[in-house]
Structures are given as structure tokens and as C-alpha cells.
């Protein structure tokens, strides 16, 4: 089994849906989350606050540097994500398709690196 990150993408240009559309979307996502959980592939999921309230932290130099706002200056951003434990990429794509339909936005699929083997 491999863990996959399913990232929900949106744009700061996207108009806020009407309240009834937003409620239906939340209901669809809750149903999708319940399906992930009931089939045992759910690891974790959450939505993110808007990208414009992010803080970038760079501790690579002698002084800590912090910058308000997202790392990438782009209109597109990650609005939420699921972490799943799946057999293969085909399964991840199938789940991403369901997640995309539920949240009404594109979903990016990325496998996570496997845990390193313990030192002997």
C-alpha cells in the first residue's frame, strides 16, 4: 500500500458559490469522507484557510526570515487535501475523481515517499 496526497485546487478568482451550492458541496464531501473511512483507505483530511493568510518561514540562513502570504505568488492554491492509503495509482485516480466531483474542483494526485528502512 502507498499513501497518496489528493490535493484540492482552486483559484482566488473563483467566485464564492451561493449558500445552497456550498451546503450541497459540504454534504457531498462529508459523504465522500465517510466512504473513504468505511473502506479503510482514509488516513487524514482537512480544508485549508485562504492562501493569503499563510506565512513562509525560511530558517536556512543565519537569520530567520518570515514572509507574509503564500510561497508562490499565483492565483491557484490548495484549498484542502486527503491523505489516503491505496494499492496503486489507478486506485488513487479513481478516488481523486470521486473527490473532485464532491468538492467541484480539480484534484491533484501525488504519491508520498515510502518510510525509509530502519538502519541495521
Task: Write out the residue ranges for each language-model feature.
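Conserved, structured core segments of small domains
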Residues: 1-120
Amino acid at each position: 500500500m502507498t499513501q497518496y496526497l489528493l490535493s484540492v485546487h482552486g483559484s482566488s478568482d473563483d467566485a464564492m458559490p451561493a449558500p445552497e451550492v456550498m451546503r450541497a458541496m459540504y454534504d457531498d464531501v462529508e459523504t465522500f469522507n465517510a466512504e473513504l473511512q468505511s473502506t479503510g483507505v482514509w488516513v487524514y483530511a482537512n480544508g485549508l484557510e485562504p492562501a493569503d493568510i499563510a506565512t513562509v518561514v525560511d530558517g536556512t540562513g543565519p537569520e530567520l526570515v518570515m514572509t507574509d502570504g503564500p510561497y508562490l505568488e499565483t492565483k491557484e492554491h490548495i484549498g484542502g487535501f486527503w491523505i489516503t492509503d491505496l494499492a496503486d495509482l489507478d486506485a488513487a485516480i479513481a478516488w481523486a475523481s470521486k473527490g473532485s466531483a464532491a468538492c467541484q474542483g480539480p484534484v491533484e494526485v501525488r504519491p508520498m515517499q515510502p518510510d525509509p528502512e530502519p538502519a541495521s
